[in-house]
């Protein structure tokens, strides 16, 4: 399977989740073996950051990368789109210190990348494959990874809210199945949003880019895009956070109520024990499967909402 990049540069702008100000982003093609890199405009010039577990400096509201005085926040939805479409090499130019939040999902980034076009390169795709079972747990939340020739996620969430409850999703992540999760938006609770705004945080958060819930209902006038949009978004976040390994990660991941902090802790553990749990693999062209033979998305939702 060959590495890929985009065919041409493409730009967008939008609101930054943290600052509430307009930020600008340009996606550029990149040479083979570049990987995903962020070129961040700062007062001292352009600083480059390549995603890896150790450069994650914050996991509160979103995943933030930082290095040498430069940082870029809210990277996970863009990274999920890049990984979901199996793009290996791309340069992300950022003005404003954040990836724009857009509508709170990855749908706009998928549209941008598809509009830019995807170009096959010459070199073989490099991946890290889970070599043996590994379990990571903290405070009752966990990630279990098993060897698997692909990227499969089984995710469970549980929230004491009548519209969420317990939800599960099982999906093989491919360019064909990624649409199952790409449109799922980030979500939060009204009491949390009000508190964050009072502290000058999440100033760009609104009903335009997040699902907001009170104690019983969704406040967004158009409601949910699917009853299990919540777990779909958690899978989206997980795909984006797993992109921090620098090259695609293959395995079967069974995830219980994780979040950005646990995802990053899991990756740091893998990186520190790479000789035990990871196998570096090149996927030659001969291993590429026709799209029609790729695994389809498999969705299973438990605990249908008590309130429709």
From Swiss-Prot:
SUPFAM superfamilies: Ribosomal protein S5 domain 2-like. Its EC number is 3.5.1.108. Pathway: Glycolipid biosynthesis; lipid IV(A) biosynthesis; lipid IV(A) from (3R)-3-hydroxytetradecanoyl-[acyl-carrier-protein] and UDP-N-acetyl-alpha-D-glucosamine: step 2/6. Pfam families: LpxC. Its cofactor is Zn(2+). One of its GO terms (molecular function) is UDP-3-O-acyl-N-acetylglucosamine deacetylase activity. The keyword Plastid does not apply. The active site is at residue 260. It catalyses: a UDP-3-O-[(3R)-3-hydroxyacyl]-N-acetyl-alpha-D-glucosamine + H2O = a UDP-3-O-[(3R)-3-hydroxyacyl]-alpha-D-glucosamine + acetate. NCBIfam families: lpxC. PANTHER family: UDP-3-O-ACYL-N-ACETYLGLUCOSAMINE DEACETYLASE 1, MITOCHONDRIAL-RELATED (PTHR33694:SF1). Belongs to the LpxC family. This is UDP-3-O-acyl-N-acetylglucosamine deacetylase. It comes from Nitratidesulfovibrio vulgaris (strain ATCC 29579 / DSM 644 / CCUG 34227 / NCIMB 8303 / VKM B-1760 / Hildenborough). The lineage of its organism: Bacteria, Pseudomonadati, Thermodesulfobacteriota, Desulfovibrionia, Desulfovibrionales.
């Amino acid at each position: 399977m060959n590495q890929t990049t985009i065919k041409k540069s493409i730009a967008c702008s939008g609101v930054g989740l943290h600052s509430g100000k307009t930020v600008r982003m340009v996606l550029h093609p990149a040479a083979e073996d570049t990987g995903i890199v962020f070129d961040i405009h700062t007062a001292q010039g352009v600083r480059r950051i390549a995603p890896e577990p150790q450069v994650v400096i914050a996991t509160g509201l979103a995943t933030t990368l930082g290095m040498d005085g430069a940082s870029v926040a809210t990277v996970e939805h863009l990274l999920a789109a890049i990984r979901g479409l199996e793009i290996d090499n791309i340069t992300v130019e950022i003005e404003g210190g954040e990836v724009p939040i857009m509508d709170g999902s990855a749908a706009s980034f998928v549209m941008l990348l598809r509009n830019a076009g995807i170009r096959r390169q010459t070199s073989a795709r490099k991946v890290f494959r889970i070599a043996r079972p590994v379990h990571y747990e903290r405070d009752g939340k966990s990630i279990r990874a098993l060897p698997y020739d692909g990227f499969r996620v089984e995710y469970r969430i549980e929230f004491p809210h009548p519209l969420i409850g317990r939800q599960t999703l099982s999906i093989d992540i491919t360019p064909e199945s990624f649409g199952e999760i790409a449109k799922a938006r980030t979500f939060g609770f009204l009491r949390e949003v009000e508190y964050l705004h009072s502290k000058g945080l999440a100033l760009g958060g609104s009903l335009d880019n997040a699902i907001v819930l009170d104690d019983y209902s969704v406040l967004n006038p158009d409601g949910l895009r699917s009853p299990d949009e919540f777990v779909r978004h958690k899978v989206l976040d997980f795909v984006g956070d797993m992109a921090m390994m620098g090259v695609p990660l293959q395995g079967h991941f069974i995830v219980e109520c994780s979040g950005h902090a646990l995802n990053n802790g899991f990756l740091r553990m893998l990186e520190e024990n790479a000789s035990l749990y990871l196998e570096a693999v090149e996927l030659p062209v001969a291993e590429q499967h026709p799209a029609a033979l790729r695994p389809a998305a498999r969705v299973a939702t438990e605990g249908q909402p008590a309130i429709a």
